[in-house]
């Protein structure tokens, strides 16, 4: 049995970045850049008005001064006239500040006169006010997005602003999902008293689809070697194959045996973890196989701890870790076993800090506990007891937020 940290190191060592590919900008969201991106222009590309108002020479401005309005400038048009002493140009937000002007007076601090041929300035203004200077955001040639950056809405906007209608990103892995167990029935069927619906396939697919799109539920299979073997062989066409169930020590836990029969190299099959001890990771060729415990909370936790970081590594992410919040424990926790625990928990902000309490649960089969949680409280294997008021770590995950 190995530690959580050592298991994750093995997984990340074996998960390799996928080759880069070029995609259209509109299809890049959620992917990671394979190359750094430099700006091909200054941003803003010109001295830009930050307000609706009047472009003026600051030295002219004193309360109640009257200026001649020489033109009106709107966004998308080039000024035709230079502002001289005693003059002003009416200007709109986003428009080019005309030559000669060194400040913009807000429209609410002015009074138009003589049918907009003149303007009275009601307030003194300093040089440079309400002007976004050329290149103050980004200079031409500057790296605006680094290699490994995840493309979100804001990065998409930057890519468009620097003229990229296509970008080079890392490919995403294909993911196949298999659930095993005689007790499982299709979710459209009403289970008999000794059966349960196959929820794991769908929750795993939902977790995977938060970061990749090529996710396929390959099916449910009984505790039968030949059936398991056949479906695993189909699943090995995927970059990552995830199985749930059939990995404990029971007479009908057959997944590990079938994987070995198929020539899968197993790197670990037990992790010092609760829930999720019987977690298996292996490879056949360049295909990665995760065989996760069948209890729903165990399945959820082990996906977050091992599968998600692996997917991120393959996609070119530079960071694979979940965010950690330090919070004050509201109630004492009894620690039963010397294994690291990840327990469904509820975080709440109080003042400038956080407080956390465990969600009541009935063990790793209690899927409903996850619906009430917004984090996983981490109980270190080195801790003997946790008292109310102790500071603890809580792992955040997109799947719970």
Sequence positions of predicted segments:
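Helix-rich terminal scaffold detector
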Residues: 4, 165-292, 296-302
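Short, glycine/charged-enriched hinge/interface segments at domain edges or termini
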Residues: 2, 54-216, 360, 396-398
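Short beta-strand/loop turn elements enriched in aromatics
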Residues: 23-25, 46-67, 103-116, 347-370, ...
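Intrinsically disordered, low-complexity, positively charged segments
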Residues: 2-64, 151
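Generic secondary-structure signature for well-ordered alpha-helical cores
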Residues: 9-20, 34, 38, 136, ...
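Flexible glycine/proline-rich
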Residues: 2, 21-26, 30, 34-35, ...
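Short glycine-rich, flexible loops that bind phosphorylated cofactors or substrates
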Residues: 98, 153, 249-251, 298, ...
């Amino acid at each position: 049995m190995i530690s959580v940290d050592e298991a994750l190191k093995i997984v990340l060592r074996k998960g390799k970045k996928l080759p880069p590919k070029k995609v259209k900008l509109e299809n890049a969201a959620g992917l990671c850049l394979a190359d750094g991106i430099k700006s091909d222009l200054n941003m803003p590309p010109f001295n830009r008005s930050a307000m609706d108002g009047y472009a003026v020479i600051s030295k002219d401005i004193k309360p109640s001064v009257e200026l001649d309005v020489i033109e009106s400038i709107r966004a998308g048009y080039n000024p035709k006239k230079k502002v001289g002493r005693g003059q002003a140009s009416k200007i709109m937000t986003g428009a080019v500040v005309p030559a000669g002007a060194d400040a913009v007076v807000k429209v609410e601090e002015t009074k138009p006169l003589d049918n907009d041929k003149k303007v009275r300035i009601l307030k003194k203004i300093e040089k440079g006010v309400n002007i976004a200077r050329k290149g103050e955001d980004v200079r031409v040639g500057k790296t605006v997005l680094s290699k490994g950056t995840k493309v979100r809405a804001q990065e998409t906007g930057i890519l468009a602003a620097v003229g990229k209608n296509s970008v080079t990103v890392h490919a995403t892995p294909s993911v196949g999902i298999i659930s095993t167990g005689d007790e499982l029935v299709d979710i459209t069927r009403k289970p008999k008293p000794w059966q349960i619906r196959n929820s794991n396939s769908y929750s795993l697919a939902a977790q995977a689809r938060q970061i990749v799109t090529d996710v396929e539920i390959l099916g449910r299979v009984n505790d039968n070697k030949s059936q398991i073997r056949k479906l695993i062989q189909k699943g090995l066409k995927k970059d990552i194959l995830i199985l749930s169930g059939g990995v404990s020590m029971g007479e009908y836990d057959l997944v590990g045996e079938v994987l070995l029969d198929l020539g899968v190299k197993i790197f670990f099959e037990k992790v010092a973890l609760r829930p999720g001890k019987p977690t298996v990771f292996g490879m056949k060729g360049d295909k990665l196989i995760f065989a996760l415990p069948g209890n729903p909370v165990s399945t959820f936790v082990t996906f977050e701890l091992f599968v998600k970081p692996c997917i991120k590594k393959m996609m070119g992410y530079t960071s694979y870790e979940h965010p950690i919040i330090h919070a004050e424990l509201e109630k004492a926790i009894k620690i039963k076993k010397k294994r690291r625990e990840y327990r469904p928990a509820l975080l709440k902000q109080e003042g400038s800090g956080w407080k956390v309490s465990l969600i009541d649960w009935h063990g790793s089969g209690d899927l409903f506990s996850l619906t009430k949680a917004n984090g996983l409280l981490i109980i270190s294997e080195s801790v003997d007891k946790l008292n109310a008021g102790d500071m603890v770590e809580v792992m955040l995950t997109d799947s719970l937020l």
